[in-house]
Regions:
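Conserved class I S-adenosyl-L-methionine
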Residues: 20-28
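A short beta-strand submotif of the Rossmann-like class I SAM-dependent methyltransferase core
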Residues: 88-91
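Short gly/ser/thr-rich secondary-structure transition/capping motifs
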Residues: 2-6, 26, 70
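A short acidic, Gly/Pro-enriched loop at the edge of an enzyme's catalytic core
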Residues: 76-86
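Class I SAM-dependent methyltransferase SAM/SAH-binding core
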Residues: 31-77
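Conserved alpha-helix/loop element of class I SAM-dependent methyltransferases that forms part
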Residues: 2-20
């Protein structure tokens, strides 16, 4: 989708995710998560909606299983892992 690619290009101008560990808050169905994964070393997408996370997991290509993970999260506490970049879009 053109708008998704436009947003990704804008994010790339502001933040370099190449080879980095990315936390995406409010990942929804993973459409941006998969775009970030083109460059990132690892992406964790979290969303409070179980149905969205389920869809994201279904859409994930087998080749991304180790580098892209999805979790249901109603609240956000301290992360268990370190991330280089945290992104939050389309979630307000």
């Amino acid at each position: 989708m053109y708008v998704d690619r436009l947003e990704l290009d804008t994010v790339r101008e502001l933040v370099d995710v190449t080879g980095k560990r990315v936390l995406e808050m409010g990942c929804g169905d993973g459409r941006f998560t998969f775009l970030y994964a083109e460059d990132a070393a690892y992406v964790l997408g979290i969303d409070p909606k179980r149905v969205e996370v389920r869809e994201a997991r279904r859409a994930r290509a087998a080749s991304l299983t180790k580098r892209v993970k999805f979790r249901v999260a109603k609240t956000i506490g301290p992360p268990r892992r370190r991330f280089d970049v945290a992104l939050f879009s389309w979630s307000l």
